[in-house]
């Protein structure tokens, strides 16, 4: 390369680096391309998400958005605002509206901490099930989805007579067994909260007949949770501040853990991130890839634990995500906003 070409190349490289820095310093704004961008690290990601995937803010001014779930029969999205003890609904054409309150703390006594519902899911009968952070229970909404009322059936409130810490996220299988995580995030004083009864943070299973069993007690800050399509693998995210990780466990026919361990360690990923958060809530696509909130946004991870791509969200911590029915859109809860991401815009 001659000196002139070398100089030009250097200038172009410098400009590219400066432009990249400028883009990453831009504030997050609604309804434009400043919300985030797509970064693909593996050729297979080309089929998963378009580089021009379209970001759109569909809700804003929440305290902490969480736990999104898609309602196929209603063609609607539900999500929690945990500190505000509310669930909101979004529908195409009509926007976002308050869906249910109270959602996770039903007592009238004043209580600090994260009181509302957190993770939301549907059971095999299409009923809404909730992690109630304030009440420290896993519950089911009694009313129809199209006419919600704040009345609940408690599915589990304790393990061996001791109250849960604060159920965080959950998933139901095809037989109506429910798997959920129970970190200390919803306790007003965390680990040292005087009302804490369990000495550990666990991953639990509620059987279809209502029996609660402990599956795992060794994961610090267990958070997001999901099942593989064949329901033979249970995935769990750890949002531990020092060592965020994703775990994969093989289940036996009785739904108990028979083997498993770390799928992907995100410690280094977090150390290099702009938004330094742990692994949080996630969902699986139709071929088993994990779309998980984590360092810098939504990380797309293969079933083998390879990071395929990143849906980078500027300036905000993402908490969870959910697909619509045909998986053309991914909805992302991110701090005070909710994002709709068209994965393959036309």
Regions found by a protein language model. Name each.
Residues 18-346:
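Sequence-structural signature of mature extracellular/luminal beta-sheet repeat domains
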Residues 1-25:
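Bacterial Sec-dependent N-terminal signal peptides
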């Amino acid at each position: 390369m001659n000196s002139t070409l070398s100089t030009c190349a250097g200038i172009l490289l410098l400009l590219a680096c400066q432009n990249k820095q400028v883009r990453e310093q831009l504030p997050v704004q609604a309804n434009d391309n400043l919300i985030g961008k797509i970064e693909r690290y593996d050729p297979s990601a080309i089929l998963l998400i378009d580089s021009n995937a379209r970001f759109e803010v569909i809700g804003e001014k929440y305290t902490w958005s969480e736990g999104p779930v898609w309602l196929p029969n209603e063609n609607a999205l539900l999500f929690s605002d945990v500190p505000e003890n509310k669930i909101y609904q979004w529908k195409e054409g009509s926007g976002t509206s308050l869906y249910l309150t109270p959602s996770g703390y039903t007592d009238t006594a004043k209580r600090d901490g994260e009181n509302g519902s957190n993770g939301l899911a549907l059971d095999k009968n299409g009923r809404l099930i909730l992690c109630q952070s304030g009440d420290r229970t896993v519950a089911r909404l009694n009313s129809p989805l199209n006419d919600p009322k704040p009345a609940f059936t408690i599915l589990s409130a304790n393990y061996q007579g001791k109250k849960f810490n604060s159920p965080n996220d959950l998933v139901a299988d095809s037989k109506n067994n429910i798997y959920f995580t129970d970190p200390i995030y919803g306790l007003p004083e965390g680990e040292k909260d005087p009302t804490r009864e369990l000495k550990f943070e666990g991953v639990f299973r509620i059987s279809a007949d209502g029996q609660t069993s402990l599956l795992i007690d060794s994961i610090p800050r267990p958070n997001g949770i999901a099942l593989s399509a064949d329901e033979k693998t249970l995935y769990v995210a750890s949002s531990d501040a020092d060592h965020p990780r994703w775990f994969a466990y093989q289940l036996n026919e009785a739904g108990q853990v028979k083997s498993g361990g770390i799928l992907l360690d995100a410690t280094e990923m977090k150390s290099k991130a702009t938004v330094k958060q742990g692994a949080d809530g996630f969902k699986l696509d139709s071929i088993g890839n994990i779309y998980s909130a984590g360092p810098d946004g939504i990380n797309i991870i293969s079933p083998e634990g390879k990071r395929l791509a990143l849906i980078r969200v500027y300036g905000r911590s993402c908490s969870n995500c959910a697909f619509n029915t045909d998986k053309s859109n991914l909805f992302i809860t991110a701090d005070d906003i909710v994002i709709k991401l068209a994965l393959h815009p036309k």
